[in-house]
UniProtKB/Swiss-Prot annotation:
A cellular-component GO term for this protein: extracellular region
Ranges for domain Inhibitor I9: 36-120
InterPro entries with a match to the protein in the record: PCSK9_ProteinaseK-like, Peptidase_S8/S53_dom, Peptidase_S8/S53_dom_sf, Peptidase_S8_Asp-AS, Peptidase_S8_His-AS, Peptidase_S8_Ser-AS, Peptidase_S8_subtilisin-like, Peptidase_S8_subtilisin-rel
Record keyword Protease present: yes
Signal peptide: 1-20
Organism name: Trichophyton verrucosum
Protein name: Subtilisin-like protease 6
Length: 412
């Protein structure tokens, strides 16, 4: 999996059904990881039954390893186990064809899909203001017409809200974060640093002091993509699980309450039922999740998590209120946000200019944090609030696509 600088267009098709369990195959453009799979349980499977299933799995794998000793390199078996909100239970790992066949025969299994590479998606009253904004997107989201250079916002600025950035990490020491950014979880390597830059740029738009929409928000880095901006779908889902648990108080409880948390996923890959179910579990937990629509100039229904209806899917606009030529579109898009030539932070200090729906999504995540700070209800319903506030501004938005551009309600 990677950021939405470029997401891989794909549709998962049912390959076969064995005793009720669907085995899915990736489309022709997916970068599948050899012998790696995600196994998703049926929604009515209890934690006790899930535990019994994984115990059976471990025992079966150990038995086969003993029989095969010395004959070939053994498969790694189960590597990750997921439980999101009691409604999404799954595991991932490395399995051979024979083991996949056995797993698929279990009644508790809903479907099995191949693991694949995911990439980042780059290509009022009492208001205060920021003049001569460093990035045009800030001014655009606080005024009804394009061309402004001032960002108008309430001084509450997202204080008391926590934003989880599921990406390449964050340079938490960057001066523009003012000590409000910290590391949450690293699922990639032993380096708590953003060696790519994508995550820091995204976080800067969400909540940088100078470059961000929610200038008082707390930021948490969840690293699921490597220095090249890539990672596995299974690893991304593990990061989603950690962030949801932390936001709900099940981890360190950074956000204290799910309704005071927002999340951003400026990444995507082929359409994945597993990813979409995990995203829905986050929404069902009462957490607002903004995601990038993707950069293939195609219908976003073919990408995940953009195709999940319960999240807030964001397409990219240009400085003159046009659709960015790379941006995905379609009925799953909820809103447009600035995404072309966006200036934000880079690791080590200073700034960088990037384009992509990766840059659009954090505008919506930051706006979500800002609105919660103003007292708006959090959770997935916040996307409806954002759509209601948005301006009908985008010219030629794409087939069957909204023309709504986000607006913070400043009255300007």
């Amino acid at each position: 999996m990677g950021f939405i600088t470029k997401a891989i267009p794909i549709v998962l098709a049912a390959l076969s059904t064995v005793n009720g369990a669907r085995i899915l195959e990736a489309g022709p453009h997916a970068e599948t990881i050899p012998n790696k799979y995600i196994v998703v349980m049926k929604k009515d499977v209890s934690e006790e039954s899930f535990s019994a299933h994984t115990t059976w799995l471990s025992q079966t794998l150990n038995s086969r390893l003993m029989r095969r000793a010395g004959s070939s390199k053994p498969m790694a078996g189960m590597q990750n186990k997921y439980s999101l909100g009691g409604i999404f239970r799954a595991y991932s790992g490395e399995f051979d064809d024979a083991m996949i066949k056995d797993i698929s025969s279990h009644d508790d299994v809903d479907f099995i899909e191949p693991d694949f590479v995911v990439r980042a998606t780059t290509n009022g009253t009492n208001l205060t203001h920021q003049d001569n904004v460093p990035s045009w997107g800030l001014a655009r989201v606080s005024t009804r017409k394009p061309g402004g250079t001032t960002y108008y916002y309430d001084p509450s600025a997202g204080k008391g809200v926590t934003a989880y950035v599921i990406d390449t990490g964050i340079d938490t020491k960057h001066e523009d974060f003012g000590g409000r950014a910290k590391w949450g979880k690293n699922l990639v390597d032993q380096m708590d640093e953003d060696c790519n830059g994508h995550g820091t740029h995204v976080a800067g738009t969400v909540g940088g002091t100078k470059y961000g929409l929610a200038k008082g928000v707390s930021l948490v880095a969840v690293k699921v993509l490597d220095c090249e901006g890539s990672g596995s779908n299974s690893g991304v889902i593990k990061g989603m699980e950690w962030a949801m648990m932390d936001a709900s108080g099940g981890g360190n409880g950074t956000a204290k309450a799910a309704g005071k948390a927002v999340m951003n996923m400026s990444l995507g890959g082929p359409r994945s039922e597993a990813t979409n179910q995990a995203a829905k579990a986050i929404s069902d937990a009462g957490i607002f999740l903004a995601v990038a629509a993707g950069n293939e100039n195609m219908d976003a229904q073919h990408s995940s998590p953009a195709s999940e209806p319960s999240v807030c899917t964001v397409a990219a606009s240009t400085k003159d209120d046009g659709k960015a030529n790379f941006s995905n579109f379609g009925s799953v898009v909820d809103v447009y946000a600035p995404g072309k030539d966006i200036v934000s932070l880079k690791p080590g200090g200073g700034t960088d200019t990037l384009s992509g729906t990766s840059m659009a999504s954090p505008h919506v995540c930051g706006l979500g944090a800002y609105l919660i700070g103003l007292g708006k209800q959090g959770g997935p319903g916040l996307c409806d609030t954002i759509k209601e506030m948005a301006n009908d501004a985008i010219q030629s938005p794409g087939e069957d696509t909204t023309s709504k551009l986000i607006y913070n309600g400043s009255g300007k």
